[in-house]
């Protein structure tokens, strides 16, 4: 283990149109919907960061990966085979069979697949990052936290905006068009069109081009109207977000790497923004709609219906050996996903002795994933019998259907004095049917029709043909208890206990199953539910010119879902015995002058796996305990920002970020 330190200094000046008519001597209030209701951020007893849509636009943040750089204990990383969302180090591994530990909730609809984390962020009202398990209101599987995204809504007054920008270093161009206003006396509309193109910044010497290249188009249309007492909002969106190449290099060769890849087959491993890799690209198409209806009930409460449909297709060509040599070039991967969901909930009017939310949720989804992996000519250098594998390939087909329903509720009970008790729970039932089939093909090679094909794939690459299908059903109950105390009108303390769960499922990427002939280490098929227990203590305060919040947390995970490299070509999916994490988050704002604001955030995290069931070659064993520090976890995060309003059209901000990473 070693410590890698890096420190970044960022200076930026951004020009934009400033909407508020004048400066104010009080700190602007941040409104969030972390508990469904609109509340001031400082009144919500949850560790949450909220980023306004205007702030996202002003900083040219175009996706969650860019946004995560300024949010404590939140990290989004796009890799060649997956996109990972991590809160407090909790994330799903690079296996499409895992449910997302940190689901996206976009306008009330769950976007549960990792590929959807690449959705462009444009024309938004706000983005909220909720840390810690959030099962009650954001659904089963939100075991690490949740990301809530709210799009800007249609307006009664006409609004029009067009912006375009160019960045010369990376050859990036972005354009945004927004039109909003009344279409008739009872119908409002909003249209958002965004495009982005980028040339990249890493030289791929093998492909003779700059990477990663981006080409994104996003269109969103909304209609809002009232029929009787019911308010409706219909959102339809479509997007194409494509990329060529990836922002990654081969670094830090270990063991005998430099001896094997030497001479004419040398692989460049310097940290110099240069890589050597085969063809890689990703093509993604998304089509969604959401219909939201709010019906005011007698007594002041609101009955809400949210009907959603999410559909996307993904096609990718990968070079999974990550080097310019023809080993596993031309790997094809496709994914098709289709989801329908329906939520109905009742929200009490608020401000009473007991404020509550109750509801029910139903979701049905289908996913189909294919993999095609050919073996390249580089293996010919190994000589027979390994060289006989050149030109052979495998096809892997996976299909899954699932149905889930849940009921949930949360109540805030105002006790005597300044005490407040919050009780919440969600009960869920989910059924899944899955199948996976892997076949080997030696057509056009010396192994066509020969039993030696299976022998060599198993002996050299630990891959074996198989055909498996099964069903599973599981129930979960996730409770939450929170006690809050108002120290004054402007400050509070709270402590909470939450249990969360993430559904089990089937291994999409397995290369074999138990009982597969000839393989040296059989892969898995089914994995079980993951569970978490989280305890938090927090403090929040606000005044006219300052706000501050602090959260300390400790979380224990049981049956943690993991994906461990098998030492050859694949990954073995299973459940680790336990993991533990603890740390803190704090963030604050202070209005230094009428036009000068200071912002600071800091986070610390200690995350370790314990009592590991499935051990890889790099695991260090200690007496009665196994410790592994997870990746994508900053041990220490620090962000300092000073923002100054120079005039009505110019804003200047200085930003310093720093992280201490344990690897």
What residue ranges belong to the model's regions?
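Conserved C-terminal beta-signal and adjacent last beta-strands/turns
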Residues: 24, 180, 334-347, 351-359, ...
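Acidic, small-polar-rich N-terminal luminal/periplasmic segments of exported/outer-membrane proteins
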Residues: 27-157, 537
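Repeated loop/turn-to-beta-strand initiation elements of outer-membrane beta-barrel proteins
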Residues: 158, 186-189, 229-232, 300-303, ...
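Periplasmic-side early beta-strands and strand-to-turn transitions of outer-membrane beta-barrels
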Residues: 148, 156-158, 165, 177-278, ...
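Structural signature of Gram-negative outer-membrane beta-barrels, strongest in the C-terminal barrel
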Residues: 224-226, 346-349, 361, 398-556, ...
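Outer-membrane beta-barrel translocator/receptor signature
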Residues: 85, 100-101, 113, 122-131, ...
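Gram-negative outer-membrane beta-barrel transporters
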Residues: 356, 417-421, 547-557, 574-649
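Membrane-embedded beta-barrel scaffold of Gram-negative outer-membrane proteins
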Residues: 288, 292-296, 302-318, 486, ...
């Amino acid at each position: 283990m070693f410590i890698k330190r890096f420190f970044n200094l960022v200076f930026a000046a951004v020009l934009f149109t400033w909407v508020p008519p004048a400066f104010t001597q009080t700190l602007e209030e941040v409104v969030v919907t972390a508990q469904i209701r609109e509340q001031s951020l400082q009144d919500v007893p949850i560790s949450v960061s909220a980023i306004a849509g205007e702030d996202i636009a002003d900083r040219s943040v175009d996706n969650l990966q860019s946004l995560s750089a300024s949010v404590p204990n939140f990290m989004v990383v796009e890799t060649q085979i997956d996109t990972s969302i991590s809160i407090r180090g909790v994330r799903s591994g690079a296996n499409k069979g895992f449910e997302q530990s940190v689901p996206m909730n976009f306008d009330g609809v769950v976007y549960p697949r990792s590929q959807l984390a690449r959705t462009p962020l444009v024309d938004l009202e706000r983005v909220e990052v909720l840390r810690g398990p959030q099962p009650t209101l954001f659904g089963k599987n939100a075991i690490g936290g949740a990301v809530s995204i709210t799009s800007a809504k249609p307006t009664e007054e006409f609004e029009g905006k067009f912006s375009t920008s160019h960045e010369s270093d990376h050859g990036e161009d972005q354009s945004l068009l927004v039109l909003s206003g009344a279409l008739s006396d009872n119908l409002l509309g909003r249209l958002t069109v965004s495009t982005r193109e980028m040339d990249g910044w890493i030289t791929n010497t093998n492909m003779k081009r700059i990477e990663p290249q981006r080409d994104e188009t996003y269109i969103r249309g909304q209609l809002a109207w009232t029929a009787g007492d019911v308010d409706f909002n219909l959102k339809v969106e479509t997007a194409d977000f494509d990329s060529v190449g990836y922002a990654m290099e081969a670094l830090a060769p270990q063991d005998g790497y430099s001896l094997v890849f030497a001479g004419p087959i040398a692989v460049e491993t310097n940290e110099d923004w240069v890589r050597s890799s085969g063809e890689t690209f990703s093509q993604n198409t998304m089509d969604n709609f959401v219909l939201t209806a709010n019906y005011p009930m007698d007594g002041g409460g609101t009955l809400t219906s949210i009907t959603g449909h999410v559909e996307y297709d993904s096609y990718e060509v990968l070079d999974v050996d990550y080097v310019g040599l023809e080993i596993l070039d031309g790997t094809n991967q496709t994914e098709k996903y289709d989801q329908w969901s329906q939520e109905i909930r009742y929200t009490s009017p608020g401000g009473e002795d007991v404020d509550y939310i109750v509801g029910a949720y139903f979701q049905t989804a289908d996913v189909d994933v294919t993999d095609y992996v050919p073996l390249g000519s580089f293996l010919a250098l190994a000589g027979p019998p390994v060289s006989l594998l050149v030109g052979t390939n495998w096809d892997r087909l996976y299909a899954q259907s699932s149905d889930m329903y849940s009921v949930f509720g949360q109540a805030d009970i105002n006790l005597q004095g300044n005490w407040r008790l919050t009780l919440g729970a969600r009960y869920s039932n989910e059924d899944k049917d899955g199948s996976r089939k892997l076949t080997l093909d030696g057509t056009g090679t010396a192994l066509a029709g020969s039993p030696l094909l299976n022998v060599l794939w198993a002996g050299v690459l630990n891959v074996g043909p198989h055909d498996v299908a099964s069903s599973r059903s599981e129930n979960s109950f996730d409770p939450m208890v929170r006690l809050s105390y108002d120290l004054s009108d402007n400050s509070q303390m709270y402590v909470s206990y939450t249990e969360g769960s993430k559904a089990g499922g089937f291994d999409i990427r397995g290369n074999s199953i138990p009982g597969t002939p000839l393989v040296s280490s059989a892969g898995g098929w089914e994995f079980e539910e993951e569970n978490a227990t989280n305890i938090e203590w927090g403090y929040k305060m606000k005044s006219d010119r300052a706000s501050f919040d602090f959260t300390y947390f400790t979380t224990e995970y049981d049956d943690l879902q993991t994906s461990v490299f098998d030492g050859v070509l694949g990954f073995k999916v299973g459940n680790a015995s336990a993991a533990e994490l603890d740390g803190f988050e704090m963030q604050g704002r202070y209005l230094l002058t009428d036009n000068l604001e200071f912002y600071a955030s800091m986070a610390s995290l200690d995350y370790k796996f314990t009592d590991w069931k499935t051990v890889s070659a790099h695991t260090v064993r200690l007496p009665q305990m196994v410790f592994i520090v997870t990746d994508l976890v900053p041990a220490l995060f620090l962000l300092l920002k000073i923002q100054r309003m120079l005039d009505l059209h110019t804003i200047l901000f200085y930003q310093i970020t720093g992280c201490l990473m344990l690897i």
